[in-house]
Design a protein with these regions (language model features):
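Short connector loops at secondary-structure junctions
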Residues: 73-88
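Conserved small/polar residues in nucleotide/adenosyl-binding loops
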Residues: 174-180
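N-terminal phosphate-binding or glycine-rich loops at protein starts, especially the Walker A/P-loop
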Residues: 11-24, 28-70, 76
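Charged, compositionally biased N-terminal leader segments and the immediate start
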Residues: 2-14
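Residue-level detector of functionally special positions within alpha-helical transmembrane segments
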Residues: 48-51, 107, 177
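Short, ordered loop/turn segments at secondary-structure junctions
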Residues: 47-49, 82, 114
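N-terminal glycine-rich phosphate/adenylate-binding segment common to multiple enzyme folds
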Residues: 87-173
Length: 183
């Protein structure tokens, strides 16, 4: 019975935190109209592994595409440091709070790949930085439009990012095995 009570308490805390998150979203301000902003800050988060290599080329392309806006001061590209696996391991934080504060100052974020430690790779067990970013920034869905005109395909796929199978996030839960299940 004690395991059931503990599981109920943990599940209650989880549900209460989700309701608090939903209430916070309801109180959030309206979506930003970027056409009315004096300056748009684009955060550049290289990540690690091949991330910095990919991002170097992505930034090169972005700089060319919005060259006039950058020169006019309408767009600022701001590199955000501190999300390498080495830094995250040194701080023992998947998403260091100082880095997250810098990310939240940006209007747009261009993010490279980030390593998520796995069993056996010699790194400490850290939660996925990607999932923490999604949850922290309330990125509730990944939208993938697919159009192939000559085949008549015009589809849009929505992939849940922070609810559904992701609802538990970094919260652990109690797994109960009853004697009848272990025979």
């Amino acid at each position: 019975m004690e395991n059931i009570k503990r599981a109920q308490e943990e599940f209650k805390e989880l549900i209460e935190s989700e309701y608090a998150r939903i209430d916070k979203m309801k109180q959030a301000e309206e979506a930003t109209d970027f056409s009315k902003k004096e300056k748009i800050i684009v955060g550049i988060l290289p990540g690690d592994g091949i991330g910095p290599i990919i991002m170097e080329q992505a930034v090169r392309v972005v700089k060319e595409l919005v060259k006039d806006e950058i020169e006019a001061g309408k767009i600022e590209l701001r590199e955000i440091e501190g999300m390498t696996i080495e830094n995250r391991v040194a701080k023992m934080e998947s998403l260091p709070s100082d880095v997250f504060e810098e990310i939240k100052k940006c209007d747009v974020l261009v993010k490279g790949p980030m390593v998520t430690p796995r069993a056996g790779d010699g790194l400490p067990n850290l939660v996925s930085a990607n999932s923490l970013l999604r949850r922290g920034l309330e990125l509730f869905a990944a939208v993938r439009p697919i159009k192939i005109k000559d085949k008549g395909i015009d589809w849009t796929f929505f992939r849940e990012n922070i609810e559904g199978e992701y609802i538990l996030g970094t919260v652990s839960y109690t797994h109960l095995t009853l004697p009848t299940n272990s025979r």
